[in-house]
Amino acid sequence: MNRTAVFWLVFLTLFISGFMLITDTIKPFFIAFIISYLLQPAIYFIESKLEISNKLASSIIYLIFLSIFFLIFTILIPIIYGQIFTFINNIPKYKNYLQSEILPPIMGKIYSIEPDIADKIKHSLSDFINSIFTILGSIANNFWRYTIITINIFVLFLLIPIILFYFLRDWDKIITNMESLLPIKTRPKILEILSAINNLLSSYIRGQLNICLLLSTYYSIAFTLIGIDLALLLGILTGFLVIIPLLGTFISFLLTLIIGYLTFGITSKLLYIMIIYLIGNIGESYILTPKIIGDKIGLHPLWIIFAIFACGSLFGIIGIFFAIPIAGITKILLLNLIKFYKSSKFYRTDV
């Protein structure tokens, strides 16, 4: 092993060890850095359109962000917190309704066609429902512990706007200094890979965040207009669960349908819920995603499914939410690794 490899091995070991020791301290800095990264396009847009300095553009975006941040914590958070508390109290009622009212008629029709398949579907659905409600029950049982954690997060978030101000102000200088630390010989190649990752992340994360916010607004307003219980909570949940391909919308639709039945009974408003989801799904699939994100991720559906299960198995719920960008980054790294391998003497030399 050469001296360069030893140096980087020791450096990475010390860096990771040090990072793990100060994880709690570094959290607000990490979050502020991510927010600053997400806000950069808005800063560049303001800077070019108004023809002002980068620092002035950063100050304008910072004030806008701070205003939105303040409104969310003073208006939306108390409402959402109250609706979460109501939802947790009603979890047993939702489960009983699903198992006694929704599934029996469906399973009865399947039994009349194919009893063997119906038994398998029944057991699979039962296991799936029990898993979902076990998770929800666990959250309910630990609600007050999560409340204490929420208070700690609130205190943590008080620091974020302060740290964010300095990140926004000195962003270009920070990035330049970070680039200067890269090895001179391999710097162009590393920057090329980082640029590809940045393009992917900026396309997906910023695009997906915009889609989630638009859908959350749409569903929250639509649910409020038809008068369903927990309208704001269900709207935000539905809007952000689209991050999970395939399963996200189905889970939120099923939950909304149950709460809709408990709110209205068997009425035409259940049909309204279906229409709201149909419009939302069409809008997300055929308008928002193609226009905002497009095909820039370039992942095959099978690779997406594999990524969801793999990341979910390794990192839990958080892993599922970040499965697609992780898969995209992995794809970029693998393509570059294959390119390096094909340009190596090992690949080109005949054995």
Curated annotation (Swiss-Prot):
Cellular component terms per the entry's GO annotation: plasma membrane
Top-rank taxon: Bacteria
One Gene Ontology biological process: transmembrane transport
Keyword Cell membrane annotated: yes
Annotated TM spans: 6-26, 28-48, 60-80, 148-168, 217-237, 239-259, 260-280, 304-324
Pfam families tied to this protein: AI-2E_transport
Protein's UniProt keywords contain Transmembrane: yes
Keywords assigned by UniProt, alphabetized: Cell membrane, Membrane, Transmembrane, Transmembrane helix, Transport
Membrane topology: Multi-pass membrane protein
Protein's cellular compartments: Cell membrane
Family designation: Belongs to the autoinducer-2 exporter (AI-2E) (TC 2.A.86) family.
Official protein name in the record: Putative transport protein RP630
Organism field: Rickettsia prowazekii (strain Madrid E)
